[in-house]
Amino acid sequence: MQTLSFLLALLFLVAQTPAQPTGEGEKGGTIQEPEATEAQDTAAVLMAAGAADGDDSDTKQLDTTFCRCRVSCNILEKYSGKCELSGRTARICCRKIK
């Protein structure tokens, strides 16, 4: 189930990433995009990781995981893979929301 959740998060990250301009047909230099800071999250994904185990079906709650592409993960976040942030390799940091 964790693998499926990770693949869904990765799919959403790829879908939300804007296409990079090739620069063909332009006279002059390349297009410069502003640098993203740690506070500016370029991708955020909310997903359901699965239902919590329990005897009573009425009391089951979904665990929700929040993932984003960052330079470094916070204390409560878990490293879940690599992503691209402003043309540089960054980390996918996830945390569970209850």
UniProtKB/Swiss-Prot annotation:
Its main location: secreted. Keywords: Antibiotic, Antimicrobial, Cleavage on pair of basic residues, Defensin, Disulfide bond, Secreted, Signal. The keyword Disulfide bond applies. It is found in: Secreted. Belongs to the alpha-defensin family. PANTHER family: ALPHA-DEFENSIN 1. This is Defensin-A1. It comes from Ornithorhynchus anatinus (Duckbill platypus).
